[in-house]
């Protein structure tokens, strides 16, 4: 891990994101350990990607189970909490994130609580059919983010992995590939959303991997992408440290390995 951090530091990395293939807040002590290890490298921006479900979860005594951890993480340098969503409607988010529950979390209250603890908040909205799939839905999501005082809002369309086979389970057909195939937006839909953002907002920057950052009536908005390979790019998009000690630069391809 130290070697990965040193390489990131030498490469001019400014942002560290704690994330995973599962939900990181299930393992709060692990987050604390990584933040402790990161502290000596003094990266300017440290972020946590989460579904947000445990942020305001209470135990049987009514205590917030992550309150002390969140306060510690903030002291250790965690600056941004990015919450994954598919919409601002609770029922839409419930279908994806808590289908086993009757209700989704109170998202506005979660955002407010994180702000009270001193964190900035990003909503990372995955665009999919039946959810955020049109310019109108994008504008409504932007209005919601502005009303909640969200610092950053990112739109990322569902993208199709290169293979229908899970590389970790060669005998199983990858159900996530099937879901992505059935729910990804068309190129026409994405184009119309980009054109709407160009009309509504001001382009602030275009990142090397193709993401575009806008100011839309005072709201920071990023139209991003995922699972994109740009072999001719002059810089890496990611340096990804895996728990097994390997350092990679792409989530999807096992051949994208540095250490």
Q: What are these language model-derived features?
A:
Residues 1, 31, 66, 107, ...:
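Aromatic/hydrophobic pocket-lining residues that form the small-molecule binding cavity
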Residues 2-6, 35-36, 64-77, 139-149:
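Short amphipathic alpha-helices and their capping/turn segments at secondary-structure boundaries
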């Amino acid at each position: 891990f130290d070697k990965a951090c040193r390489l990131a530091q030498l490469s001019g990395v400014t942002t560290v994101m704690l994330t995973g293939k599962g939900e990181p807040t299930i393992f709060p002590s692990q987050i604390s350990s990584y933040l402790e290890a990161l502290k000596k490298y003094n990266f300017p921006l440290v972020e946590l990607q989460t579904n947000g479900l445990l942020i305001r979860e209470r135990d049987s005594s009514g205590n917030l189970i992550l309150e002390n951890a969140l306060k510690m993480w903030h002291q250790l340098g965690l600056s941004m909490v990015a919450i994954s969503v598919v919409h601002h409607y609770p029922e839409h988010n419930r279908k994806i994130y808590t289908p086993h529950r009757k209700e989704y979390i109170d998202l506005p209250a979660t955002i407010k609580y994180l702000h009270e603890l001193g964190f900035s908040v990003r909503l990372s909205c995955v665009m999919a059919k039946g959810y955020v799939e049109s310019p109108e839905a994008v504008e409504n999501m932007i209005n919601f983010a502005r009303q909640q005082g969200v610092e950053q809002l990112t739109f990322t369309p569902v993208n199709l992995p290169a293979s229908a086979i899970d590389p970790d389970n060669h005998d199983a057909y990858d159900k996530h590939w099937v879901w992505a195939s059935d729910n990804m937006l068309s190129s026409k839909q994405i184009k119309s959303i980009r054109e709407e953002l160009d009309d509504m907002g001001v382009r602030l920057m275009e990142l090397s991997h193709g993401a575009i950052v806008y100011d839309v009536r005072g709201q920071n908005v990023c139209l991003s992408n995922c699972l994109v390979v740009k072999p001719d790019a002059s810089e890496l998009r990611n340096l990804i440290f895996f728990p097994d000690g390997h350092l990679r630069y792409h989530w999807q391809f096992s051949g994208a390995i540095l250490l």
